[in-house]
């Protein structure tokens, strides 16, 4: 049937900040859904707390609220906007949970849940109901028991036995779950799982570890038409969360009759659940037998992968189904001529590999279980599985350690960690057999034989470096650089022997029909599908997998650059390998290349056409690092392509501390005393000359990797080893650390003649906390007009001095009324989306236009003033990564961000804290423990909290300090002093807020245990006095005045 005419206005709930288990895939699906609904003339109201999303752009939805994703707040938005329907399945687990909560609140009495009905959500998410439904329709599930209380553990052990898998209901990325082999492990995981579950329910399930894990992505409409979009197979067996596993599409290890059995089961399950839209179904399979593991009655991480793997726009189709359309009425937008009821067909192999944050968190537990730890993923496409594996490993952009010790290899293979996939290749190099590795890993021998083939090719290249062998290696996904190293032949000679790659098309139909929105992958030995034209073309380098320090913000900038260039009539191509993002959606660019982001891959694309230019400044640090080598290759090959925007030399000046210091001296701009060193000895000499404490950091790295504040020679010696390791060919930078300074960020655009300042952000955290981890506010709250005038002056001088064309981010610090410049980055920064949303200036779009020759004076933008206050706060991943130090410092740890907006700082900060899952209490008990040097300052904060009606608790030193000032506080034991202590109070739910600022080693040890408890039990915690001061202001504001609930357009309409 045609779309329903009674649905005129739809509310879509976004997924909030990027976090482990819920990344950019929901911006991709939500944006696609908004576009799909508006194509049908439906008004879309969107609510999301994440400013770094395309879906919160003014052109994506009709009305946009950047507000905390809380049922009570969304209920008020529903009351105000009066939508006819709500679309819950595009916001991930967050969207589903909120829809269920809104229904339970009674907020959906006059609002229809579109697509998948509420009962299907309950049956898919509530473990007990799901198990009952599967048993009713005769589908096998693992032997299991539902738990709601800890005292049921004895019964579990009796009925299910050990080991078991624990799966909490209504949680994200397996959060709170795990595998228990002992009673103690079971008790610990269940306690946290019950806490994390929205309905305090966990499923205890018999272990099917070692079985194959299979996934089917299914689509169904109201007419009961079902299509299988994609089948996927995890290389890692059951026991590793699918988000943590290497995944292959399509399924390659089942016989046809087995595949048809699983296909039929998938359709039977989606029909029983009455899902209308997309649905992901996971199975365990072994020797012709299977178990249904779980169902996601929504678009998911796997949906994004299936969508990109096949070219089938799952979210677009699901949104149209939600408003009553049938699959045979919906046109496949990729082909433009086939209906969405045609099942996709693919003639290639897709490989997904997760990206883990262990390069940042070296002390974290690296074991892979049923709870997610990865931050992002890459996707590679090849004609063979070998080619897919090799291209995926090149895409992942992380150091892969080599192992030669056989005992070490056996240990890694037996216990799954992030190192296991790479270590399998080491095992083959060391002579292990397929059977040995299969018995250690339970990985299907089919995959192991393919991996063994790759190692055999390596050996053949070394012993027989002929042109034929080189061509075979190129077809198997080996890079030219790798082949050159293995053969001992020069790279240029290898390239000539291998020949240039060709590009094949992803079109949903194995080339049966022509595609109108093509995207491509490279391979060797076949004909190319690329069709050239005479249009002016630009290639934009994407940002690759989401990782700490390089998140969705850079994809946001990439998409904005595409839109800006297309507005100017330029044909835009993107190269990226992240299946979760909007930039890799089928219709974002004119052409998309799903490729590794290495130099030779980018150069190969440039050789396919006469590109006018290539843009590197929107893809984050990794893309910027390619600027100089890319320029050299372009010159060497005589390509007609320019690096658009700021020159590679300008980028080098900004990264090279000596050159940048010379520029600041020439411009008469103050900077902290600093130097650079290539050795430990030189670093010690420089640090002693500058004076401790100093900030040590490698150059040309992202997110403050290996950055530390060091206080003496001993600490410096330790940290230099890590700094030299991550930045081998570049100097280590040493800066005097400005204690108690106020840190600032400025985002600006320069066209070579003029500078547009987008926004000046004041950090809420102290100097020394990485800018990516600090909350910040626009406009600034504590700086004088004279200081801000100097900030503007220095920004303009540096932009002009560097010769910036495009974006520039400048970090500054203010101490004793002196403005110091810390660093400049002539590229997109992670704060660009926040500044753009807070001010209404689309900085990335402006920058892209400037980079192709437009002038700021003609574009009509100027720095703006406004009545509202916007606060950016970060989301930290400590609840997903046991073992990580929770103290904030100069190395970035956050995964995502949120924005709070209101008419004063207190309410804006309160909203930001709620959005970041750090809900500040307006009543109850507060625990405070600070260092001796901070006692004076904490008195003022404690007095304010007391006056606001909160009850204070603290350790001995802090309590004595407060009592001396006449502030009543209750004494609590330190952790090492035994029970009862603050951790016991946290477990009992007696503490509502923790303020703990550790300094020495013992207080850090206490702090870690306290923060770990806070994370596990969902208690807000604060680790700096600046944030504590801001929290007190927020609690004060929220007790005096209600938060404002207005769309972002309302605030921006008042901008001057």
From Swiss-Prot:
The record's SUPFAM superfamilies line, in alphabetical order, gives: Carbamoyl phosphate synthetase, large subunit connection domain (SSF48108), Glutathione synthetase ATP-binding domain-like (SSF56059), Methylglyoxal synthase-like (SSF52335), PreATP-grasp domain (SSF52440)
* Highest taxon, organism lineage: Archaea
What pathway does the UniProt record associate with this protein? Amino-acid biosynthesis; L-arginine biosynthesis; carbamoyl phosphate from bicarbonate: step 1/1; Pyrimidine metabolism; UMP biosynthesis via de novo pathway; (S)-dihydroorotate from bicarbonate: step 1/3
Keyword tRNA processing applies:
no
List of residues binding Mn(2+) 3 = 811, 823
CDD domains from the entry? MGS_CPS_II
PROSITE patterns, A to Z: ATP_GRASP (PS50975), CPSASE_1 (PS00866), CPSASE_2 (PS00867), MGS (PS51855)
Q: Which positions in this protein are listed as binding Mg(2+) 4?
A: 823, 825
| Region annotation (Allosteric domain) ranges | 920-1056
The protein's matches in SMART domains, at most eight in alphabetical order, are given as: CPSase_L_D3, MGS
Q: Where does ATP 2 bind?
A: 697, 736, 738, 743, 768-771, 811, 823
Task: Please list the cofactors this protein needs.
Answer: Mg(2+); Mn(2+)
How the cofactor is bound: the record states:
Binds 4 Mg(2+) or Mn(2+) ions per subunit.
* The protein's name: Carbamoyl phosphate synthase large chain
Organism, as annotated: Methanosphaerula palustris (strain ATCC BAA-1556 / DSM 19958 / E1-9c)
Instruction: Please name the gene that encodes this protein.
Output: carB
